[in-house]
Amino acid sequence: MTMSASRRFALLDWAARHQAWILEDDYDSEFRYVSRPVGSLQGIDAGDRVIYMGTFSKALFPAVRVGYVVVPPPLWTRFLESRFAFDIFAPTLYQRSLAEFLKTGHFARHLRRMRSAYLERRDALLRGLDRHCGDLVEVHNSDAGLHVTVLLREGLDDQEVAARLGRRGLAAVPLSNCYVGPVRRQGLLLGFGCAQPQRLHAATRILGDVLRERV
């Protein structure tokens, strides 16, 4: 969920007043489909209270295994000491190759291509949900990222639905697994990043069949 501008500034103000640190994991921020990517907290933080983290594993491929942290100056030494204490850095060849990929503009072009590909997959998933699941689901949080949140009609059990999907070769995360407190709504997290549009459309047909079996 993307925070509103007022909430962002309120959080930064709280961190400054209490000398607290904010850990910002900018997960999947590159993949936004309805507008320009939203700026980071770190980019509007005048008080150096945000520790900004990211990875290239999602935008490129998992095997690259290179992430990064933008650390406020007061923490530079402590972070370097901690890093050296735990493990060595990513291989120099990986780092230099990635730096060249960024510097020459190839990464920006790659992101544009990936946004287009993931937008096509997201749209295929949304069309399939609308056609095959109808009023059995409510779709939320589809503007960015590589998954959508689907709330189920009252009376449907997301654990049971996910288990039935698993038996038919599909993976879905029950939303009830994600609550810290009491479960308020049953639902599913549906990923679309690694499937072609035709496969996603077929998967929504199976989901619709499973839901209707339980209604």
Give the location of each predicted region:
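PLP-dependent class I/II
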Residues: M1-V215
